[in-house]
Amino acid sequence: MSKSIINLQSVENQQILSITPPNTGLSLQGTLQIPGDKSISHRALMLGAIAEGETIIAGLLLGEDPRSTAECFRAMGAQISPLNSEKVTIQGIGLGKLQEPLDVLNAGNSGTTMRLMLGLLASHPDRLFCVTGDASLRSRPMSRVIQPLQDMGANIWGRKNNTLAPLAVQGKSLKPIHYHSPIASAQVKSCILLAGLMTDGKTTVTEPALSRDHSERMLQAFGATLDIDSQTNSVTINGHPKLIGQTVIVPGDISSSAFWLVAASIVPGSELLIENVGINPTRTGILEALEMMGADITLENKRILTGEPVADLRVKSCQLKGCTIGGNIIPRLIDEVPILAVAGIFATGKTIIKDAAELRVKESDRLAVMASELTKMGAKITELPDGLEITGGTPLKAAEVDSYTDHRIAMSLAIAALNAKGKTIINRAEAAAISYPKFVETLQQVCGDSN
């Protein structure tokens, strides 16, 4: 097997990743353990902090986003052990007992931290909380959670007519509501359910389509009472449950697996086994989309871990074919659209991704950025108002591209570079550490690069 040359350099406060695949003979091989699921890691930290007693989390993602969550809840009184191993212990403080912090809470780059936490902060009477984030997070819309919280009686102030962070939250007693969300968003749903923990009565969220359900599963595991109506995509939570600390085993993140599923599919002669991956049905849109494209993926050793379905994923290279991806599947693969765009480049025919306008308000405008950066590499890709149109079959050439400090962009471009001719340079590659601290090491491993 010929080797790629993969180098990561630090230059002037940024990391630059360069990837030079061999002219012939590259194939990806190996068995991978991927980082813990980011969505589940956030929720385990939050619920452990507000539950009574001890919570033990095994397999926690040690990325920057969960660290932001841990720091915020430490500042409000929870005792959380250092995030320097994948086993973390939390001494919870009990529901309704978050302390007023001495300083501003910083959510970093994490929209999940800020949006979910707002539901808890708004429902703690007689306490003032100030929340901010990095430049990217301060530009992301918060009205989608602030509006329903205000409907519950919350007092929240922010920039741009209370839509952008930094935010000030004056906690108070909230009233239960039935909120009909205009978008399928697990962050919106989870924020309202967490606010509902402290209300007198039942709080309901109805969505236009099913979004990921990690919050519902974990709330039930910690002792909350929920009524879930899958026919109407509605979830109801009863206020004032007794939450008890739990042992949580975090499965591998299917969003992180997606990079290797696509990489092994598009690099000829490849075969990877990705172990211990969460296959929650609200997250498996990526598997269904790749199946539509003809990918050779098998699920082995299916099992249940702490209420979440898990399997090992075996993927072998094959010729992908273009297809149209849209509708209700989009909320179930929203984070995987950038890497799906890469799959489309190497598929025969045309791939259309639609109904994904939500990607314009992620860590970057992911539709615009993927179109611009892949075009630099020679891809035939056109931006749509709510998606991308990709014509496959055009060989990629090396180029200098930019992550725009977006972790999923950085990693998607790295996978594209494996099939590009020449040396591709990815600027601001440090963004990958937000959700996948050892991404470059794993890339070197599967490519047989010992650098």
UniProtKB/Swiss-Prot annotation:
Binding site for 3-phosphoshikimate: K38, S39, R43, S185, Q187, D335, K362
Binding site for phosphoenolpyruvate: K38, G111, R140, Q187, R366, R408
Keywords, ordered alphabetically: Amino-acid biosynthesis, Aromatic amino acid biosynthesis, Cytoplasm, Transferase
Disulphide bond pairs: none
Protein localization: Cytoplasm
GO molecular function, one term: 3-phosphoshikimate 1-carboxyvinyltransferase activity
Entry's Gene Ontology cellular component terms: cytoplasm
Active site (catalytic residues): D335
Domain of life assignment: Bacteria
A Gene Ontology BP annotation from the UniProt entry: amino acid biosynthetic process
Pathway given in the UniProt record: Metabolic intermediate biosynthesis; chorismate biosynthesis; chorismate from D-erythrose 4-phosphate and phosphoenolpyruvate: step 6/7
Catalytic activity of the protein: 3-phosphoshikimate + phosphoenolpyruvate = 5-O-(1-carboxyvinyl)-3-phosphoshikimate + phosphate
One Pfam family, short name: EPSP_synthase
EC number(s) given by UniProt: 2.5.1.19
Function: Catalyzes the transfer of the enolpyruvyl moiety of phosphoenolpyruvate (PEP) to the 5-hydroxyl of shikimate-3-phosphate (S3P) to produce enolpyruvyl shikimate-3-phosphate and inorganic phosphate.
Record note on quaternary structure: Monomer.
Family of the protein in this entry: Belongs to the EPSP synthase family.
Protein name: 3-phosphoshikimate 1-carboxyvinyltransferase
Gene from which the chain derives: aroA
